[in-house]
Amino acid sequence: MIKDMQPFLQQAWEKAGFKELTEIQKQAIPTILEGQDVIAESPTGTGKTLAYLLPLLHKINPEVKQPQVVVLAPTRELVMQIHEEVQKFTAGTEISGASLIGGADIKRQVEKLKKHPRVIVGSPGRILELIRMKKLKMHEVKTIVFDEFDQIVKQKMMGAVQDVIKSTMRDRQLVFFSATMTKAAEDAARDLAVEPQLVRVTRAESKSLVEHTYIICERREKNDYVRRIMHMGDVKAVAFLNDPFRLDEITEKLKFRKMKAAALHAEASKQEREATMRAFRGGKLEILLATDIAARGIDIDDLTHVIHLELPDTVDQYIHRSGRTGRMGKEGTVVSLVTPQEERKLLQFAKKLGIVFTKQEMFKGSFVETKPKAPKKKKPAFTGKKKPR
């Protein structure tokens, strides 16, 4: 399939070191190339971004100096990650992209549009604002992609989404992607799309090389287990908590134990978040602590471990957290630190997901699978009779 694409895409694919398409890419690329509307669901880390970018970049006409593809995403971080992929796969060509996010200087964004980007990646609100200012022309847009569409629906961005769609020609293609396509999101997508093709890839089909493990410990022991995991060597981890007010407390305790740790806060400024992520990607930090909201949109290629310091409330949260390791066919480890009372909830997650969770202990700096204790032999009941000699 890659061999049938534009030479610049083949070269970028080889340069990125990819060997074969993931399951979502195999299923979605032909349908998108045909121009059909698509609703796609695939776990985090399975190559969803390239599943839509590759066919759409292949179809772009560089001679038409207007936006031809628009990608809408719910968070600043996700917008920037998608934009980076566009830059990587169009390097050395006439095709360029522009990222348009809320909160950034709109005058600079208008200047970006004067350079004739063929691919626009942005937040629904800011893109709609530029359309209304008549700075972003949509008449040549052939495809609109909605990445993490469940979050777009959840964050009540549908008004902006509908207005952006209305600004394009009627024959445009709509593509909806999500790691967890909720019923509400799927219903909303079906209302907007025309005879959409449904592409759904399960965790089992995605050939994940992620190992899901758990350790039973008391709540007070969890920080020490994080320390022991980090000392296993060459570990780069994100640890998740539910309570944002505990982020700094736990981070300071880990730093006191000589770990290069930092907290990622949802309310941190763009500059603070970017500085933290730069330090983490550059190896100055070995572990990030975050909540689900704070970690939204984070994408780190070489993340070795995801640690659930606190078990998430839902299966969907578990999927989103855990999908940050083992991306694009790489190996990864997910460790849940659970109290004896939490074990039952975790095993319910395992049953719903169809995943085998390995119960482990730590011994001499390594994971060791917990062996079930042999049942004690019952002593024969005393009958009062003496054994015959």
Curated annotation (Swiss-Prot):
Residues the entry annotates as binding ATP: 42-49
Originating organism: Bacillus cereus (strain ATCC 14579 / DSM 31 / CCUG 7414 / JCM 2152 / NBRC 15305 / NCIMB 9373 / NCTC 2599 / NRRL B-3711)
Record motif DEAD box, residues: 147-150
PROSITE patterns from the UniProt entry: HELICASE_ATP_BIND_1, HELICASE_CTER, Q_MOTIF
Protein name: DEAD-box ATP-dependent RNA helicase CshC
Compositional bias segments (type: Basic residues): 373-389
Residues in Helicase C-terminal domain copies: 209-379
MF GO annotations: ATP binding; ATP hydrolysis activity; RNA helicase activity; RNA strand annealing activity
Spans through the membrane: none
Region (Disordered): 368-389
GO cellular component, one term: cytosol
SMART domains registered for this protein in UniProt: DEXDc, HELICc
Residue span, Helicase ATP-binding domain: 29-199
Keywords noted in UniProt: ATP-binding, Helicase, Hydrolase, Nucleotide-binding, Stress response
Entry's induction text: Induced at 10 degrees Celsius.
Function: DEAD-box RNA helicase. Probably has an RNA-dependent ATPase activity and a 3' to 5' RNA helicase activity that uses the energy of ATP hydrolysis to destabilize and unwind short RNA duplexes.
Record note on disruption phenotype: Longer lag phase at 20 degrees Celsius, wild-type growth rate at 30 degrees Celsius, no growth at 10 degrees Celsius. At 12 degrees Celsius cells were short and stocky, by transmission electron microscopy the cytoplasm appears empty although cells are viable. Decreased growth in the presence of H(2)O(2) and diamide.
The keyword Hydrolase appears for this protein: yes
Gene Ontology BP, a term: response to cold
Gene3D superfamilies, per the entry: P-loop containing nucleotide triphosphate hydrolases
PANTHER family listed in its UniProt record: ATP-DEPENDENT RNA HELICASE YFML-RELATED (PTHR47963:SF7), DEAD-BOX ATP-DEPENDENT RNA HELICASE 47, MITOCHONDRIAL (PTHR47963)
Domain of life: Bacteria
Alphabetized InterPro entries for the sequence: DEAD/DEAH_box_helicase_dom, DEAD_box_RNA_helicases, Helicase_ATP-bd, Helicase_C-like, P-loop_NTPase
Reaction catalysis annotation: ATP + H2O = ADP + phosphate + H(+)
Motif (Q motif): 1-26
Gene name of this polypeptide: cshC
Assigned EC number: 3.6.4.13
